A protein has these predicted regions:
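Contiguous, structured surface segment used for ligand recognition
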Residues: 25-183
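Bacterial N-terminal signal peptides that target proteins for export
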Residues: 1-8
Length: 708
């Protein structure tokens, strides 16, 4: 290729926005010409009604793979595969493989090459001279552009990964004047798969295809581990970068045979710790991690996260998600990928993003019905993640003797959610049932069954006296419910393993501690289980309204404030605002409280005497966080300073993350009447979830009894 023409092109565009500036923030837009009086569209299909495309003579292997995937997508959408055809309405170009003649033709189209030609992985899609023009700056950029065509046709990047088919469409077209340029905000975007038992050569191709659709370009190796050498043939054909010890290796050159190594400085290792694996972290907390500029690793600190180097005020070099159970983190992976490309991808908030993501998979009507199910699922799992229910994490503080049996009340919430899930499943078309099972039903049912298995086993252990289990009907009834949940969980997993002729059997994880048999004080036969189930606690009949048990206690979600006072403006005239954080915390709507901001609550109580005040915040996820202090003043008294941070990886830190809350308590003496509670953030990264004022100072419970 003759690069003189490119140089001429750059000379003509020196006054334009530089690619480096565009790359500092994802540039992604669609615009329509205002002076078009009668908007027209360009059809994707040719005269025969089949989608067709043309492409330059020489392309990289990953581009050819993307074209095959696009062709299959078009068959799913229109009923016919897309075919290469001279003069097609869709014209595709890989810039770094063009001949002089091809490049000259592209220049004449008038596409804004200067905005993306030197950016890695970038692409352009627009209309020119009655054609849909698709241009990639390099091999990956071209492949991503082709996958973007699939997305524009209604094929979600996560559809195939979750056995969902796109909505069929008779006609596909693009409006004249449409123009889109996308440049990744984060240069290296990918996954760390180290220690993943499911990762093998058989699954590499599926994983690489998922990465291509998500526009992820990097596999990360940690501590010298080489997972099957990352299957060199697949890695090379999909143009995937390999990163190890903060160095990334790229294959470059026109013939794609040169290796180039680059040192990475600022890296977000997302959920890399054993205590915070991606599938055990709320999507809302993942979003907090992505948006927090202090959540990163640097080469010089080597696995120590701290404040960004003074030399690096730019975007992170890499975002790497540590994945141990890829079938359970579809939403998180989609979110990470979209935000790595476009800093405004979640500007509407995670709740809106969840709605749009579900719509891309199930359609708008079904998505509106599914969203409340997922919101309740995230609330219940934020109270206790399934992985942290089982041993070796120990017994939880769920107490059957408080608030009319809070243990059974929590399980009843899961019962209601399961019923709603089954009822919705019946209304879905057959071709959405498998996808619904994988994205919605399996996570909900497995979490519910694990909770029931472990909490009822805990109850049986608490009730049974040593050596007397065979004669203790109450303990045996709880044990029977636990074993019944375990048997149902095994059936659920067996169904998943057979789904799609076993296509996911080597990927989904069914051997974790949370999947194992419950630890019980004795054994029961199948016949015993069936009989004892009849005498078990009846959640439909035996549970009374929570408000019945709320005497002498006031519990509130942080978002239920009476007044809120923003933090004083910073020296530059700006200050972070108080923000609600949907899908985060036991409240499912925690409050991010900037340093200096205040929440005030006013309430009435008829109780008199000593009381215990407990504050719950979202635990720190920054290992080098120095302070997370909150002051609490009750009725205008001297504020009590609560240090919410625990030493990283300490027992207290782990217990906070297992619970999903950091707790701090102190005691006060109050009269009856109206009271005020004032909560003020004294440091950054404070996210307040709930608080409780209990006049029964010795009462033990797990879930704050919020009645509103």
């Amino acid at each position: 290729m003759n690069y003189k023409k490119i140089i001429v092109g750059f000379a003509l565009s020196l006054a334009c926005l530089s690619v480096q500036q565009a790359g500092a923030e994802t540039f992604s837009k669609s615009k329509k010409k205002e002076n078009v009086t009668a908007a027209t569209s360009i059809n994707w299909a040719d005269a025969s009604g089949k989608v067709s495309y043309s492409i330059n003579a020489t392309t990289a292997p990953v581009v050819k793979i993307a074209l095959r995937m696009f062709s299959n997508d078009m068959k799913a959408v229109t009923g016919n595969e897309a075919k290469e055809k001279f003069g097609a309405n869709i014209q595709i170009y890989q810039l770094n493989q063009l001949t002089n003649k091809e490049f000259s033709a592209v220049e004449k189209l008038g596409a804004p090459l200067h905005k993306f030609i030197t950016a890695k992985d970038a692409f352009y899609i627009g209309t020119r001279k009655g054609k849909i023009i698709v241009i990639g700056s390099d091999a990956r950029g071209t492949a991503y552009a082709i996958m973007e065509l699939s997305r524009m046709a209604g094929v979600s990047p996560m559809a195939g990964w979750n056995d969902l088919k796109p909505q069929t469409r008779q006609n596909l077209s693009t409006q004249v004047g449409t123009e889109k340029i996308e440049i990744p905000r984060i240069e290296f975007r990918g996954l760390a798969l180290n220690g993943s038992k499911w990762m093998n050569q058989k699954n590499y191709s599926q994983l690489a295809r998922l990465m291509l659709r998500l526009r992820a370009n990097t596999l990360w190796q940690v501590d010298g581990k080489h997972e099957a050498a990352y299957n060199k043939a697949v890695v090379d054909s999909f143009d995937i970068c390999i990163a190890e010890n903060y160095k990334v290796t790229e294959i470059t050159g026109k013939k794609h045979k040169k290796k180039h190594k680059k040192t990475l400085e600022n890296v977000k290792m997302i959920c890399a710790g054993n205590q915070m694996q991606l599938e055990n972290v709320s999507p809302a907390l993942v979003l907090e991690m992505l948006n927090n500029r202090d959540y990163l690793e640097t080469k010089s600190e080597h696995r120590e996260k701290s404040h960004r180097s003074e030399m690096h005020h730019d975007e992170d070099c890499a975002w790497i998600a540590n994945v141990t159970n890829p079938k359970m983190v579809s939403l998180q992976l989609a979110m990470i990928s979209d935000l790595a490309w476009n800093g405004e991808a979640l500007q509407g908030g995670i709740s809106s993003y969840l709605q749009n993501w579900l719509s891309s998979l199930f359609g708008n009507v079904a998505a509106k019905k599914i969203k409340p199910l997922m919101e309740e699922y995230y609330r219940l799992t934020s109270i206790r993640q399934p992985a942290f229910m089982a041993m070796p994490y120990g017994d939880t503080e769920f107490h059957s003797g408080e608030f009319g049996n809070e243990l059974e009340r929590y399980l009843y919430a899961y019962d209601l959610l399961k019923t709603k899930t089954v009822n919705l499943e019946r209304t879905l078309p057959a071709d959405q049932r498998d996808g619904f099972f994988e994205i919605v039903k399996y996570p909900i049912f497995s979490a519910a069954l694990i909770a029931e298995k472990e909490l009822e086993a805990q109850e049986a252990r608490d009730i049974a006296r040593p050596g007397l289990f065979p004669n203790d009907d109450e303990a045996k009834a709880s044990a029977a419910v636990s074993l019944n949940a375990f048997n149902t969980l095994k059936q659920l997993n067996a169904y998943y393993l057979k789904l799609g002729k076993g296509k996911w059997s080597s990927i989904i994880a069914t051997d974790g501690a949370e999947m194992q048999a419950p630890q019980l004080p004795g054994t029961l036969s199948s016949k015993d289980i069936k009989l004892l189930m009849q005498d078990a606690f009846d959640r439909n009949q035996d549970l009374q309204p929570l408000v019945t048990f709320s005497k002498h206690i006031t519990a509130k979600n942080a978002y239920d404030w009476t007044n809120a006072f923003q933090a004083p403006a910073a020296k530059d005239g700006t200050a972070e605002k108080i923000q609600l954080k949907p899908l985060l915390g036991h409240s499912n709507n925690a409050v991010k409280l900037p340093k200096g901001a205040i929440l005030r609550y006013r309430f009435v109580s008829s109780s008199i005497g000593d009381a215990r005040f407990t504050l719950a915040t979202i635990p720190s996820y920054l290992p080098n966080e120095k302070n997370m202090r909150v002051s609490v003043s009750i009725d205008g008294a001297e504020p009590v300073i609560c240090q919410m941070k625990e030493d990283y990886n300490s027992k207290e830190w782990k217990m906070n993350h297992w619970r999903g809350q950091a707790l701090k308590s102190f005691y006060v003496t109050l009269l009856d009447g109206y009271h005020t509670v004032e909560i003020k953030a004294l440091d950054d990264n404070i996210i307040v979830d709930q608080w409780v004022l209990d006049f029964d100072v010795d009462r033990e419970y797990y879930v704050f009894p919020v009645t509103r």
